[in-house]
C-alpha cells in the first residue's frame, strides 16, 4: 500500500514540477498590480475555485489587459455564471480566461454583437478562432465588471492547459507579495466506523507557540479509524480577504497519509468539493478542510494513503503533524496527539433509519415518493430516515413534505425523485429550503406522475405554478430602456424583445432581474417605435408587455 501511495505522491510532485517547468511570467491582467479577493482552489459552495479573483477598487470599467500575446479563441455571454467572458489562446499551450467583464474591447464587441443579432440571442457561446482577433501583451482586451453570477465588481482570471482544458494555478505564472504562513482557526477529529459512518467531530484546542507552530496537546478519542479536519485560511500582503490554502499535508507517527498541492484541477471534478470540505461547517461560515475521504484521489491536486484515515488502537498514542504553506513557501505547523482512551464506538440504527452505502445504488420510498440513488452518489455512508409530514406555511397554507432529513446533504451524482399520482397542470417538484422557501427543480411529466433530479438530499414538496412572470417597466434613462422581470417559482426560462416586429438586443442580468436595452439599436427608427416584451417561465406561463418608445 505504501509503495502505491509513494507512486501517487511522486506523480503529484512531478505534476508540480512540470507546471513549474512549463511556466513563463505573465503580465497581470489589470494595469496596476491588484489585490486578491479569492485564490485558486478555494472551497466554494458548489465548486473548487478555478482561478484568481482580483479586486477592482469596488467599481467597474477598469481596463483588462492581455497577459501575453494571443488570439481570441472563445467568447461567452451569459446572464449567469461567468457573465461576459473572453478566452485567449497563447503559445506554450495555455489559454487565459477573463470573466465577469462589463464589456469587450471594440474589435471583439463588434463581432459579438453581429453574432447576437444573427442568432437573435443575448446569450452566446462562440468559437472565435476563425475571426483571427489577435492581441499583444499589454493591449486592452476588455473592461472589468460585475456580470453573471458575480457577487460584486471584480475580475475572475484563469490559466488553462489548452489541450486538456485543466485549470492551472495562475500564481505559478505571477509573482505575489506574501510573507506570512496560513492561519490556523481550529482542528477537528472525526471518528469513523468500519462502515464509514462519521460522528460529530471532536474539536482540538490549539495554541500558537511561536514561529507559526500550533500545539494541541493530547486528545482522547474512541479507538478505531479517525479523520482530521483543519480550519485554516490564508492572507496576502495588503489584503484582508480570506484565501484558500495551497499546500496541506497530514502525517501520523511520521507517515504521511494526506497531501494536497493546489496546482491543477479538472472541471470534471467540481462535484468533489464536498470531499475536501465539511459541508455543515461551511454552511455555518467555517472553512474546514477534510483530509480524509473515499473519493479524494480523483482530484488532480490530492493524494492520500488509506483514504487519509488514521488508525488509533485502544490505549495507544498517535503523533499527528499537519503542515500548511502558501505558494511562496510560508509555512505553518500543527502538532497534537490522539489517545485511544475510549472503547470503539457502537454503531446502530434507530427505528425507521436506513443505512445508505456510498458504493451501492439504493432507494428511499415513502408513500407516493420514491428517490433513487446511483452508486457513488454519496461521498460516504449516510444514515437516513425518510418521512412524509404536513406543515403550515405562512400561518395559512398546509403543505405535504417528503423529508430525507432536516439538514441538506450534498450529492456527488444527482438523485432521481419520483412523485406518483395525478397533479394539476403546471405542477413542479420543489426543494424546501430554509424559512420554508421553495426552490423549483426542473420537473418532467411521466406516466407515473412527476419526476425531477436533485443534487442534494433534503425536503421536497409539489407546488403548482399558475402565475405568469412579472414585468416592471422602469422607463428610460437617457439612451437606456430598462425592465425588471421576475418569476415567483419555476423561474424565467426565456425572454424576447421585439421593436417594430424585429428582434432587439437587450442585456439580461439575472441576479438583479434587470433587462436593459439601448434606443440606438438599429431596429429603432425616428419617431414612434412599438416595443413588445415577452417573458416565459419554466412551465410556460407567459407575460407580455407592450409600449411605444419615441426616438428623436
Q: Language-model segments: what does each one mean?
A:
Residues 346, 358, 386-429:
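Proteolytic processing hotspots in large secreted/extracellular or virion-associated proteins
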Amino acid at each position: 500500500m505504501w509503495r502505491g501511495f509513494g507512486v501517487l505522491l511522486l506523480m503529484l510532485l512531478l505534476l508540480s514540477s512540470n507546471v513549474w517547468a512549463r511556466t513563463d511570467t505573465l503580465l497581470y491582467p489589470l494595469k496596476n498590480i491588484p489585490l486578491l479577493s479569492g485564490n485558486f482552489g478555494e472551497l466554494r459552495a458548489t465548486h473548487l475555485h478555478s482561478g484568481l479573483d482580483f479586486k477592482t477598487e469596488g467599481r467597474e470599467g477598469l481596463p483588462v489587459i492581455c497577459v501575453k500575446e494571443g488570439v481570441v479563441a472563445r467568447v461567452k455571454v451569459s446572464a449567469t455564471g461567468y457573465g461576459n467572458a473572453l478566452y485567449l489562446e497563447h503559445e506554450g499551450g495555455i489559454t487565459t480566461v477573463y470573466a465577469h467583464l462589463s464589456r469587450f474591447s471594440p474589435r471583439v464587441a463588434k463581432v459579438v454583437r453581429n453574432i447576437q443579432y444573427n442568432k437573435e440571442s443575448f446569450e452566446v457561446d462562440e468559437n472565435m478562432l476563425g475571426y483571427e482577433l489577435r492581441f499583444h501583451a499589454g493591449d486592452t482586451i476588455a473592461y472589468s465588471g460585475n456580470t453573471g453570477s458575480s457577487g460584486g465588481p471584480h475580475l475572475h482570471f484563469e490559466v488553462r492547459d489548452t489541450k486538456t482544458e485543466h485549470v492551472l494555478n495562475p500564481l505559478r505564472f505571477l509573482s505575489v507579495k506574501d510573507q506570512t504562513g496560513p492561519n490556523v482557526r481550529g482542528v477537528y477529529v472525526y471518528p469513523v466506523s468500519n462502515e464509514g459512518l462519521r460522528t460529530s467531530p471532536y474539536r482540538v484546542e490549539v495554541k500558537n507557540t511561536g514561529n507559526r507552530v500550533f500545539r494541541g496537546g493530547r486528545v482522547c478519542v474512541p479507538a478505531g479509524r479517525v479523520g482530521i479536519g483543519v480550519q485554516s485560511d490564508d492572507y496576502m500582503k495588503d489584503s484582508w480577504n480570506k484565501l484558500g490554502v495551497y499546500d496541506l499535508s497530514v502525517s501520523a507517527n511520521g507517515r504521511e497519509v494526506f497531501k494536497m498541492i493546489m496546482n491543477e484541477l479538472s472541471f470534471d471534478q467540481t462535484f468533489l468539493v464536498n470531499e475536501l470540505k465539511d459541508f455543515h461547517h461551511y454552511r455555518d461560515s467555517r472553512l474546514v478542510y477534510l483530509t480524509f475521504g473515499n473519493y479524494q484521489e480523483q482530484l488532480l491536486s490530492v493524494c492520500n494513503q488509506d483514504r487519509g484515515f488514521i488508525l488509533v488502537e485502544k490505549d495507544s498514542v498517535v503523533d499527528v503533524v499537519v503542515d500548511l504553506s502558501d505558494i511562496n513557501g510560508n509555512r505553518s505547523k500543527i502538532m497534537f496527539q490522539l489517545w485511544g482512551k475510549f472503547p470503539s464506538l457502537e454503531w446502530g440504527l434507530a427505528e425507521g433509519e436506513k443505512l445508505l452505502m456510498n458504493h451501492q445504488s439504493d432507494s428511499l420510498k415513502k408513500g407516493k415518493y420514491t428517490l433513487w440513488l446511483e452508486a457513488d452518489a454519496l461521498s460516504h455512508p449516510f444514515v437516513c430516515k425518510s418521512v412524509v409530514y404536513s406543515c403550515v406555511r405562512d400561518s395559512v397554507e398546509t403543505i405535504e413534505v417528503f423529508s430525507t432529513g432536516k439538514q441538506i446533504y450534498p450529492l456527488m451524482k444527482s438523485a432521481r425523485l419520483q412523485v406518483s399520482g395525478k397533479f394539476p397542470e403546471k405542477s413542479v417538484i420543489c426543494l424546501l429550503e430554509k424559512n420554508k422557501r421553495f426552490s423549483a427543480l426542473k420537473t418532467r411529466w411521466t406516466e407515473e406522475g412527476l419526476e425531477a433530479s436533485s443534487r442534494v438530499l433534503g425536503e421536497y414538496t409539489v407546488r403548482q405554478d399558475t402565475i405568469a412572470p412579472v414585468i416592471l417597466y422602469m422607463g428610460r434613462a437617457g439612451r437606456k430602456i430598462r425592465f425588471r422581470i421576475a418569476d415567483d417559482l419555476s423561474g424565467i426560462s426565456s425572454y424576447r424583445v421585439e421593436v417594430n416586429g424585429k428582434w432587439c438586443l437587450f442585456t439580461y442580468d439575472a441576479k438583479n432581474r434587470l433587462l436593459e436595452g439601448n434606443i440606438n439599436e438599429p431596429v429603432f427608427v425616428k419617431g414612434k417605435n412599438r416595443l413588445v416584451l415577452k417573458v416565459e417561465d419554466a412551465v410556460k406561463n407567459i407575460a407580455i408587455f407592450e409600449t411605444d418608445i419615441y426616438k428623436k
